[in-house]
UniProtKB/Swiss-Prot annotation:
Annotated ranges, domain Helicase C-terminal: 284-462
Protein name in UniProt: Lhr helicase/uracil glycosylase
Region (WH domain): 553-623
Residue span(s) of domain Helicase ATP-binding: 38-235
pH-dependence annotation: Optimum pH is 6.5 to 9.5.
Region entry Lhr-CTD, spans: 898-1538
Consequence of gene disruption: Not essential, it can be deleted. Slightly increased sensitivity to UV, azidothymidine (AZT) or ciprofloxacin (CFX), a radA-lhr double deletions is more sensitive to AZT and slightly more sensitive to CFX. Greater sensitivity to AZT, H(2)O(2) but not to mitomycin C.
Lineage: Bacteria, Pseudomonadati, Pseudomonadota, Gammaproteobacteria, Enterobacterales
Cofactor: Ca(2+)
Effect ascribed to mutating D1536A: Loss of uracil glycosylase activity, no change in helicase activity or DNA-binding
Reaction catalysed by this enzyme: Couples ATP hydrolysis with the unwinding of duplex DNA by translocating in the 3'-5' direction; ATP + H2O = ADP + phosphate + H(+); Hydrolyzes single-stranded DNA or mismatched double-stranded DNA and polynucleotides, releasing free uracil
Length: 1538
């Protein structure tokens, strides 16, 4: 201890005593980076401070500047201009980081202030303010009027301040701190910031000191140059003492042969995910989360973050049910990423929340605080938590899949142990074996500090143009001075004056042609004076259209004109980046449905359904620009090290030392070597050729150099292939290579020559090709927008993307003729420098041509392991979505190569991927048992034995069309001529064809007859192999036990032989003991694919209509058996519980009060009685609310479950002005609380005003409030009375509205004709008071209710429900639910529009019903009110066409009869007219009319006369007799009812 230095000796003598004493009280000693930073700051030098996270560099940057403010405040030496300006400017690349810094600054500010008070020094209070895009306008105004001493902002907000009056608050800035400077230095955002800093310096009397804070970077000099521009910058980069603990975790021994998830886990959600690595990854992550106090799990995409969050919560909930003792101590939150269970389970605890850019900032803040406080154990995030946000004491970071870069990996792992002296602990969970190799290299680079080089954009002219307009909008610019200032910023230090002038020419309207006249100039350039001034509107344009983040558009995906039928054409959206990679006839996937691109327009993608087709690879392009070439070379070097065995013979790094990790790496290398002979690497590329399913060649170049190298290379290759073979090569580039498809050719096979180019020629090809590419067009629009050449019509409002594209295309069309136009130059630079890495490609090509790097070519029968990963990298993402509907999973997987199936899926469940009915059909066909497949004649019998193998006489007869006598005669002849012979096999006497004699002898030891010809006795090379293959090719699916029994062999011999056949590629192992011949599987697959694609086609509207009848409890799921007439409703539910379920499903639906008890409830509850509803109302379990008055005796009424009323009830708006005095008095009485009888209400009003209340007026006022949704009664009796009242009764209650002069309306004498016992006033009345939900909760509840009610959320359903915000708002919510895995999007029902959302089980049930419809014709007809939500016709779907003049409508009193979903009959309101839909010359069954009369009998008082059916007098129609038999009676006018 005596050797430890005195902490005060480590503190530089640059601070005031108060600051020094505070620091020594607060900390044991400064960190390594802090004293060095303070020395540099004290010398007023610019500094780049490089240190890992948790090293105290933020305090190092601030403390000297803070101390100076305290000293000057105490000495009262501040200059006047400084009193109204900020002194310290902190710039953060992310808003949340600024919030953290504001909070953390309070510690030194308060500590130093307290220390000054203790020392008796002058009190100084320094203020901190934040100005970002989230700062309200009022707060921004306050900051401008009264600037804080320390201002925290973002690059974009700094730009806006410099381009407004707020810049005056920056004139006294002395210190600028740029945090996470490495995060912006390599982008246009950083270039934009660099020029903003130069504009800031132009405001100041003395240039501000710049201090940049950075995590570890590879080239400190590059970042320092970016920070300082032409100013010298001192780099503070002490040796990093932090040694992270990193380990790669592989939970299985073979990632490409994952056995089924162990049973007994209690997790139903694993069903259908056999063979997937994901259940093991999820379980492993949950185990680690439970072992640590706080964990951040990083993923590389938002969709994966949402799904992984949901899976972790489901697993945790399942574990908690089995073992309550594992419950974490922390509090739990309601999930905001979408519930993982149904509503009754929504209150379950959960352990993880998601955090990414699509989560609202409020929810992100809640998540961050919960993790910091220990209330939340786990956050699953994307790069949103990668930078320096203070997340508290995080114990562990888990990275799923390889991080996007080495720097990203360091940043993410650095989130753990973030505090000073902490140790970062991280785990990597790779998803594939190739992912494992990449992760190993990333981790090695992290330990070695080999980070990627930053490549700042060079002379970005679009950013220069924008900043020039912004600067000129505030002050007239002297052009030479502005040029000098621009060149002080590092990105433009080499900017040629000619290019600078061309940019000013563009901004000032000096275009090279009159074609540009539509694009107005922004500036005025006086050539004589050299002064640049802004045109009117330039400042507003600069602040409303500024920034560098591209407005990457979304293309609307639509059905062709006329294909929408009754629904919407809109299918969804595609990102612009995806569209530029797409072509006509590509297959894309949106939600659960596949679509073929028919046309790509300026802002739309027109598609047609392509059921079950796999989507094209580019639509699964990952985030980021791809792997840097340098990192790719390191991965290639590592592969060579693995291939030559040197790695395994040396000391294996601890992070790779786990047994599973080593086994998977070794397995991958060995399998790749066996497949291609050479393991691809950095010095030896491999060209692999193999045929695809239809016989075309797939050309796969294995190269590790990354997408930025491969994409431009692919451009040239595509052109060469097109020139050689005259076809679209469909060339696709990825980080691991290039894939091309070439048509089958009899000529020379493609070899390595198609990949070799002269370097200069290759670069020329790429440069020429890129200018006409869709990539160039998309980037041109972004560059033009940054250069402010495409402002919106209304400043401050976003221009629709289609308009942006139109203007950009017009500008591009003009500018393409002028290669020196600045935006053309910038777009070329961006494509060739930022998107592509042409220098790396040129180096690679020179090394290939010089022989330093070799290319070997090989032909394989099936893709090698590396090729499998390259071809189907997107499949892992797709297969993780195991909750896709069954038909889509079958169809998409079945589109893959048969030989790749086992590697992609592991242990495949054939019952899921192969149609069971297809399996049965193919088995019968192969065994010659199917009709039309049986043998005929003598030769047919011989063919049976030759094709199927030895059989008994009985088996042969079963497969022959002849009689048993004929079969016996044929066999006798065959035996006589020695074409067949008898043999004992497996204890049975069978007949075999002579060609099998030696085979049976050598394989099975069968004793042969002595008289066999010698020619049949020669030894066979592979006798057992031949027998097995024939048996497998004659059956659909086979088990080892079947083979063992068939040939009387031991199971070990059978399994060994099967494994050999598998290695030879002749058979496939679909499960542990299910085998299939390759040829048979191809047949099964094609037939199953056809069946699956049929299943993925939208079902008929009648199928959906049938689903709704089943879903809403009108008919049982078993409906479809022969229909039998029943005199009662076929409702599914019974008793009070049944009524409760109906109300739950129809909660909030407004229906005529007259229908609830006459049609709606009886149609679903077979034993319904009014006492059931009264009981629920009396107990308070159910409440009702009025919505709208319908005439004098009816109105729309909704029912609600009391417990969930907030989800279905919309509170009435307080409309005091339109309420009568009596209505206001009633509301005032009920507002005191409780429920009151009408007489009590009257009495309380009289007590208040001292006068009696006219009971008729009271009744009228109460019902007016009912229809306003303000009050309700605790019984249904008032509604019954209302709907049953006759016109006479209504007349008796009418009264004169003439009031006595001078007396209020509620003070009239009591009418003797109305009493308090009137049923219309029965029950206790109360206010409808429901605690409202916020908009998000309300919309989610509406969506869940609609899914329960209708099964599918469609535009029509939203219109029917009158949802606030309409379908666009509901569609936004549904997309979020889709992202979290709750629902799927697709085109499931014909005529329901392109955008439909449903749960997976609903989709599967729809298709089950569609299949049954082809097999069953007998359905129970059921009559419903036309208004019934279970009736889709005229609501969710249009009424079927009918030639009659009567137009059906959904009106109270109208009835429909539906059978199997098909609309058969419509009875109009009033009963006078009827429509009947029937097939030609075919009468409706009597049961249809019995169903109608069953519904009519529910309304005993109903009376009407039916006169017309289909525009004909009813007496002249065949329906006359059927209706009489059903219960109508004849009358002169037609048919009477009642």
């Amino acid at each position: 201890m005596a050797d430890n230095p005195d902490p005060s000796s480590l503190l530089p003598d640059v601070f005031s005593p108060a600051t020094r004493d505070w620091f020594l009280r607060a900390f044991k000693q400064p960190t390594a980076v802090q004293p060095q930073t303070w020395h540099v700051a004290a010398r007023s030098e610019h500094a780049l401070v490089i240190a890992p996270t948790g090293s105290g560099k933020t305090l190092a940057a601030f403390l000297y500047a803070l101390d100076r403010l305290f000293r000057e405040g105490g000495e009262d030496t501040r200059e006047a201009h400084k009193r109204k300006t900020s002194r310290i400017l902190y710039i953060s690349p992310i808003k949340a980081l600024g919030t953290d810094v504001q909070r953390n600054l309070q510690i030194p500010l308060k500590g130093i202030a307290d220390e000054r008070r203790r020392r008796g020094e002058t009190e100084v209070n320094l203020r901190v303010g934040i100005r970002t895009g989230d700062t309200p306008a009022q707060e921004r105004s306050k900051l401008t009027r009264n600037p804080p001493d320390i201002l925290i902002t973002t690059p974009e907000s700094l730009y806006l301040m410099l381009t407004s009056r707020a810049r005056e608050t920056l004139r006294g800035v002395e210190t600028v701190i740029i945090d996470e400077v490495h995060a912006v230095a390599g982008s246009k955002r950083g270039a934009h910031l660099a020029l903003s800093l130069e504009r800031l310096d132009a405001l100041l009397h003395t240039s501000a000191q710049r201090i940049g804070l950075s995590a570890t970077v590879r080239s400190a000099s590059d970042v320092a140059a970016f920070l300082g521009g032409d100013r010298p910058v001192t780099v503070v980069n002490p040796p990093a003492m932090r040694h992270p603990q990193i380990r790669i975790v592989v939970p299985v021994a073979n990632m490409d042969d994952v056995s089924s998830v162990a049973s007994g886990t209690g997790e139903d959600s694993h069903a259908g995910r056999e063979g997937s690595i994901w259940p093991y990854i999820e379980t492993g992550i949950l185990d680690e989360v439970l072992r640590h106090r706080s964990t951040i799990v990083f993923t590389n995409s938002r969709g994966l973050a949402e799904k992984l969050t949901a899976r972790l919560n489901e697993l945790y909930a399942a574990r908690l049910q089995r073992s309550p003792s594992i419950a974490v101590d922390a509090a739990h939150f309601e999930s905001t990423s979408g519930a993982t269970s149904n509503r009754v389970q929504s209150s379950d605890v959960f352990i993880a929340r998601s955090h990414h850019g699509s989560v609202s900032k409020e929810q992100r803040a809640i998540t961050e605080q919960a993790l910091k406080s220990g209330e939340l154990r786990c956050v699953v995030a994307t790069s949103s938590l990668e930078l320096g946000i203070d997340m508290g004491a995080v114990d562990l970071v888990i990275q799923v899949a390889t991080p996007l870069s080495v720097a990203s990996g360091l940043q993410r792992i650095g989130r753990a142990g973030h505090q000073v002296g902490g140790v970062s602990k991280g785990l990597f969970f790779p998803r594939t074996r190739r992912d494992l190799v990449d992760s190993a290299v990333i981790v090695e680079c992290m330990f070695a500090g080999r980070l990627e080089n930053l490549t700042p954009p060079h002379n970005p002219l679009d950013v220069l143009a924008q900043q020039t307009v912004a600067a000129a909008a505030m002050d007239a610019l002297q052009v030479d001075e502005w040029y000098s200032r621009v060149r002080r910023a590092a990105p433009w230090k080499d900017l040629p004056r000619r290019v600078f002038d061309a940019t000013l020419d563009m901004l000032s309207g000096r275009y090279p042609s009159g074609d540009f006249s539509a694009f107005r100039p922004k500036l005025v350039w006086n050539r004589e004076t050299g002064i640049l001034t802004a045109r009117p509107g330039a400042q507003l344009l600069a602040v409303t259209s500024g920034g560098t983040i591209p407005d990457r558009g979304m293309y609307s995906v639509l059905l062709p004109e006329g294909e929408e039928k009754a629904g919407s054409r809109r299918v969804g959206e595609l990102d612009e980046e995806m569209v530029y990679e797409s072509r006509v006839n590509d297959i894309i996937t949106l939600g659960a449905t596949s679509w073929r691109i028919q046309q790509i327009t300026r802002d739309q993608v027109i598609v047609t359904p392509a059921p079950g087709r796999s989507a094209r690879l580019p639509f699964w392009r990952g985030e980021g620009n791809g792997r840097p070439a340098e990192l790719g070379e390191m991965i290639g070097d590592f592969l060579h090290l693995l291939a030559d065995g040197a790695f395994f013979s040396g000391t294996i790094p601890p992070w790779l030392a786990e047994e599973n990790t080593i086994a998977n790496i070794q397995g991958l290398i060995e399998e790749q070597r066996n497949a291609t002979g050479i393991v691809p690497g950095s010095r030896h590329l491999v060209l692999e050729r193999c045929r695809d399913e239809i016989g075309d060649w797939r050309i796969i170049l294995h190269s590790p150099y990354g997408r930025r190298v491969h994409e431009p290379w692919a451009v040239a290759i595509a052109g060469r292939i097109h020139a050689l073979w005259g076809a679209d090569a469909s060339v696709v580039a990825s980080d691991d290579g290039i894939v091309a498809r070439i048509p089958d050719t009899d000529g020379k096979l493609p070899d390595a020559a198609i990949f070799l180019f002269e370097p200069e020629k290759l670069l020329q090809i790429v440069r020429e090709a890129v200018g006409s590419s869709a990539l160039f067009a998309a980037r041109f629009r972004e560059c033009a927008a940054r250069a402010l050449l495409m402002p919106g019509r209304t400043p401050g409002h976003r221009t629709p993307l289609w308009q942006q594209r139109l203007r950009a295309s017009q500008l591009l069309e003009i500018a393409q003729g002028y290669p020196d136009f600045p935006v053309i130059l910038e777009t070329l630079r961006e494509c060739l420098q930022d998107v592509y890495d042409l220098p790396a490609l040129e180096r690679l090509m020179r090394r290939l041509n010089g022989g330093e790097i070799q290319i070997s070519d090989v032909t394989t029968t099936t893709p090698s392991p590396f090729a499998t990963s390259l071809l189907f990298g997107y499949v892992a993402e797709f297969m993780y979505q195991s909750d896709a509907p069954l038909a889509e999973r079958r169809a998409s997987v079945l589109s893959l190569d048969s030989e790749l199936l086992r590697n992609l899926l592991g242990q495949v469940d054939p019952g899921e991927l192969l149609d069971p009915q297809v399996i049965r059909q193919v088995e019968e066909e192969l065994q010659r048992l199917a009709p039309g497949r049986r043998a005929k004649g003598e030769e047919g019998l011989f063919d049976l034995l030759r094709e199927l193998g030895p059989m008994t006489v009985e088996d042969l007869a079963q497969r022959h069309t002849g009689s048993s006598e004929e079969v016996a005669s044929y066999l006798e002849n065959l035996l006589a001529v020695k074409r067949i012979f008898p043999a004992m096999i497996s204890g049975q006497e069978r007949l075999a064809c002579m060609d099998d004699a030696a085979r049976l002898r050598d394989a099975l030891g069968v004793r042969l007859p002595e008289s066999l010809p010698e020619i049949y006795l020669h030894r066979v090379s592979y006798p057992l192999r031949d027998l097995f293959l024939r048996y497998l090719r004659a059956h659909a699916l086979v088990t080892a036990e079947q083979l063992a029994h068939e040939f009387s062999l031991g199971i070990a011999i059978v399994e060994e032989q099967l494994q050999q056949l598998r290695e030879q590629g002749l058979v496939m192992n679909l499960q542990q003991d299910i085998w299939v011949s390759d040829e048979v599987f191809r047949r099964l697959r094609l037939r199953s694919l056809q069946a699956a694609r049929e299943a993925t086609r939208p079902v008929a509207a009648t199928t959906y209509a049938r689903l709704l009848l089943e879903r809403q409890g009108v008919l049982p799921a078993t409906d479809g058996s022969p229909a039998l007439f029943a005199s009662t409703s076929p409702g599914v539910y019974e008793g009070v519980d049944g009524v409760m379920r109906v109300i739950e499903q129809l909660a909030g639906v407004g229906l005529p009060a007259s229908l609830w008890e006459s049609q709606i409830l009886p149609a679903r509850v077979r034993d319904y009685s009014s006492e059931m509803l009264d009981e629920l109302l009396a107990t308070g379990a159910v409440i009702w609310s009025g919505q709208k008055k319908l005439g004098e005796d009816d109105g729309l009424v909704a029912l609600h479950l009391q417990e969930y009323a907030a989800e279905s009830f919309t509170p009435a708006e307080a409309d005091q002005a339109n309420r009568s005095a009596l209505q206001q008095a009633i509301v005032a009485v009920l507002a005191d609380g409780g429920a009151w009888f009408a007489q009590q209400i009257s009495q309380r009003i009289r007590d208040k005003i001292g006068e009696s209340v006219d009971l008729s007026a009271l009744q009228e006022a109460l019902w007016a409030l009912v229809w306003q949704g303000v009050i309700t009664s605790d019984i249904w009796a008032p509604l019954r009375a209302l709907t049953r009242s006759s016109s006479n009764a209504r007349t008796s209650t009418r009264r004169s509205h003439r009031a006595r002069r001078g007396r209020p309306v509620y003070a009239q004498p009591v009418s003797p004709r109305v009493s308090y016992n009137t049923p219309n006033l029965a029950g206790r009345w109360s206010l409808l008071q429901v605690e409202p939900l916020n908009d998000t909760e309300r919309m989610l509840a509406l969506a869940e209710n609609m899914l329960d009610r209708y099964g599918i959320i469609s535009r029509q359903a939203v219109i029917a429900e009158n949802i606030p915000g309409g379908f666009p708002s509901m569609q936004t919510l549904c997309r979020s639910m889709e992202d979290s895995g709750r629902i799927m999007r697709g085109r499931f029902v014909e005529g329901l529009g392109g955008a439909q959302f449903a749960e997976r089980l609903t989709i599967d049930r729809l298709r089950d019903l569609a299949t049954q419809a082809t097999q069953t014709r007998h359905y129970t007809p059921v009559a419903l009110s036309a208004n019934d939500p279970a009736n889709v016709w005229g609501n969710l779907l249009p009424w079927p066409a009918h030639p009659a003049t009567l137009v059906p409508t959904r009106r109270a009193g109208a009835l429909v009869v539906v059978s199997g979903g098909k609309l058969l009959l419509y009875l109009a309101q009033g009963g006078k007219k009827m429509l009947v839909w029937q097939e030609k010359e075919e009468l409706l069954a009597p049961e249809v009319f019995h169903a109608l009369t069953t519904a009519l009998r529910r309304e005993p008082r109903l009376r009407f006369t039916l006169t017309e059916v289909n525009d004909l007098p009813v007496r002249q129609t065949p329906m006359f007799t059927l209706l009489r038999e059903a219960g109508f009676s004849s009358s002169p006018q037609g048919l009477d009812w009642g």
